[in-house]
Amino acid sequence: EIASCLVGSEMCIRDSLKEELFDQVDIDPANIYCPDGSMPKDAILDFCRQYEETIQSVGGIDCMLLGIGNSSNIMFNVGGTTISSRTRMVLLEGASRKEAARTFPSQENVPAGIITMGISTMMNARSVILMAWGEDKASIVAKTVEGKVSDAVPSSYLQNHPNAKVVIDLSAAYDLTRISHPWLVTSCEWDNKLIRRAIVWLCQLTDKPILKLTNKDYSEHGLGELLALYGSAYNVNIKIFNDIQHTIT
């Protein structure tokens, strides 16, 4: 949303940026390029074209700093946005309208449209940093980083960017494989808590009770390290079964 401004609103996003960022740093106002949401609607198309031309005339974008919406929208590029999209006006509907409502007293105050950069504009930046905080972003962060690249999840396009970074806290990272199922991607330091988590996961995956798990189950699902540590599936099964039993009683 760095270069987005709500159309027809006195509470433009650029005003928030001015107060919270631009007024706090040493930056020449002539070097700030924000869409003007107060322009007449019939001027928006030409403005968007000129905005893209301005980006090119100054040598392109060095770095884009982005957030991500709970529905995977980047800026206001929602599901279904094509990779060729550029700066334009979009209508605010559904989830994107709820995202915009955070800027206003209520959802009823949110205007109908917004000017936003497009996916192509973002992908042409030399570097992109995507940030997300909190457990409510965990699911969409996992889809963004590890899911299939799809226009249904616009943020997933960043998988194909040559210099993109995702900066998140542990809560937002919770659904990533290296956090939720680290044994699938790396060697682990196996403590009792991690072993229990892995075995419960394996039981759910194979639809078997703990004591029915076999060496093959462990080997085929990334848990061969536990066989090496404990000698057999039987030994791991008994250990975890007893641990859980003692915890319950």
Q: Which role does the model predict for each range below?
A:
Residues E1-G8, I13:
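Single conserved hydrophobic/aromatic residue that forms the stacking wall/gate
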Residues E10, D15-I248:
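Conserved phosphate- and dinucleotide-binding cores of soluble alpha/beta proteins
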